[in-house]
Amino acid sequence: NGQWFAAFTGTYVTNPSSLDIDHFVPLANAHESGGWSWSSGTKSSYYNDLSDPQHLIAVTDSANSSKGSRGPDEWKPPDSSYWCQYADTWIDIKVRWGLTVTSAELTALESMLGTCDGPPTGVYVLPAATSTTTNTATTASTTLTTTVVPNPGNTKNCSDFSTYIA
């Protein structure tokens, strides 16, 4: 019993079966933007990266299905208030892993960064979770720590990454 924040939709989810753990930069996108040249060890490090709390994040299964392997030039989170953080995180992961961006991807990222209130900080502050069990609302701050990655379903499995063909 608990709550998980689904960043792409800006909602709290209480049913864990409606969540997916998503590679922020999808495996196919990473492959196409330079991951194809990685050793199997580097690929394994990428798809199991728990050193960055934004690399693998909890999202609603519907948002994850909608995003698929698309980059920001083809898909944006439904919650536009998350666009600044989304672009900042996307860029951070691409830079950290030495991945490239297309010109269309760069244009989309620049547009999304244009929604920032100031320079991106790299820190996303979760909105307060509210619940009403009586006539009064209670507010709590929630931090999500994920250590076990569930099966991503029948779309692409992490083990498929090493077999991607350009």
Model feature map: region roles:
Residues 144-165:
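Extracytoplasmic/periplasm-facing segments of secreted or lipoprotein envelope proteins
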Residues 1:
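Active-site acidic/histidine clusters and adjacent loop/turn architecture
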Residues 130-148:
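Extracellular mucin-like PTS domains
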Residues 4-130:
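Domain-level detector of nuclease and nuclease-like folds
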